[in-house]
Amino acid sequence: MRISALSAENPLLYSESCCDFRQKIWTCSVKFVPLSVFHNQMEKIHIKDKTFKPYISGEEIARAVKRVARRIEADVMDKDSSPLFVVMLNGAFMFASDLLREIGRPCEVAFMRMKSYEGTETTGTVDLLQDLHADVNGRTVIVVEDIVDTGTTMHALLQHLQRRNPKFVKIASLLFKPESLRYDLTVDYAAFEIPRDFIVGYGLDYDEEGRNLKDIYVIDN
């Protein structure tokens, strides 16, 4: 299992040169272990019929969100005075809230809701539960998502947005599973790359529970 964190040069690559061994957050062994787990006394949790173990701490999430915000500011906010952030409900609400506070510049925020998950599995079909009401025509759009897994939902969303003639669309996702991706799309800003395991917390749910957790947990098989 390997997880990558955002570096200043590339949003999808971890730079080992940025810190010495004691400061590294990620291990390069088979199992990913956030170092702060040992300090925060994070414990396993139980949600309905599943057990989840600690994966990424709230402190590590906060640092990654700041780095994503800096990249968006440099790439978009410095060049476009009126970008539109489209927040995908329900999962991205915590990531979007922290990300937009870090950006701290005037911008328009709108919300959409699509669904392709039942329990721990993607259904392969996408339902539009709440459409976008903001004007997209000729504008820079930044989609804020909790996770890009197979890409099924994101592919459907991009097709939906392109019909409204945006200037261009960028994707900012808290989590990205490159090994699971089935579509030709680019995640422009990803705080973390993770393997295919099912996770919960920080907005992500298992059967609508666990969104309120400040840390991220992975299913304990």
Language model: regions and residue ranges:
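PRPP-associated nucleotide enzymes
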Residues: 1, 18, 27, 34-221
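Polybasic, lysine-rich low-complexity intrinsically disordered segments
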Residues: 3, 10, 21-25, 31
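Leucine-biased recognition of intrinsically disordered, low-complexity hydrophobic segments
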Residues: 6, 12-13, 35
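Juxtamembrane/membrane-water interface recognition
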Residues: 13-19
